[in-house]
Amino acid sequence: MIFFGSELFAGGHSSTLQDVKARGKLRCVVTTGLPGFAAPDANGVWRGFDWDFCRATAAAVFGDANAVDPITSTGKTRFTKLNAGEGDVLWRNTTITFSRDVSVKLRFLGVNYYDGQGFMVNKSLGVKSAKELDGASVCIQTGTTTELNLADFFSSNNMSYEAVTIETNDEARQNYEAGRCDIYTTDASGLASTRSSLPNPNDHMVLPEIISKEPLGPAVRQGDDAWADIITWVLNTTITAEELGVNSSNVDQMKNSNNPEIRRMLGTDGSQGAELGLSNDWAYQIIKQVGNYGEIFERNIGVNTPLGISRGLNALWTKGGLMYSPPFR
């Protein structure tokens, strides 16, 4: 049987995977810089919640979480860079929508952060509600769902606004800090990140209204289902590990667990690695080098970080949240 235009090799393995392995590095499409999610630190080392999922992918493929390069992108360029082959996978605070899934020819592969759009203001404005923002100037990133949500919210509440369009989070922060806009609107997680980087974070507040659903997740190009499977199960590994109590500190002991699902996940039993075109300890490497979902969350954006975000909807389903993974079976 002959397949034309297929991105799969014989045996069902991914051509993207083969390209990544041949290159020796994963290329991960990320933001230009969003503290807590993906940004270089003072030494130029990339860190953050989304960046850790890039690292988890590299750990699964190479057994080395550091075998990854950032492909920085704005809201306008992220999909172009992915579809043009500049990046292998997108882990970049990106909302899953109908049009992006269907028209942009991407495959979204689960939700790694449940978010919603909010508004940040300087407390000196005396504003307590987003419904008090009539006539305000608003900093807003182009090429995002935020633009459309903002227009809908103001229209439905019979309010007007002046858009101050920007392309990157740094540009938004600079304009907001300089007073060129009264309000900054983006996903609530992004607001927490921006607020933490301001000189006096306590002078600013995020208003109570959340005006949209923003399920954020990874994406790959359409046409390589085997590569999509790998990214899907990288995310699922982190969630399942947290649910089963497996973390970076105890994963070595857990390889000897009597729990059949833990043994399958860690490669002690079964052949899941071979079925993905990976080594049988691929999930072990993710957990050992990067951690489970809870570790990734708390280390980068949790309540004890400058962002101070509580788990909320991103808690496990067993703890009142929405995080839920299919079983390793």
Residue locations for each model-derived region?
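Short helix-initiation/N-cap motifs at beta->coil->alpha
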Residues: 13-14, 68-80, 125, 163-178
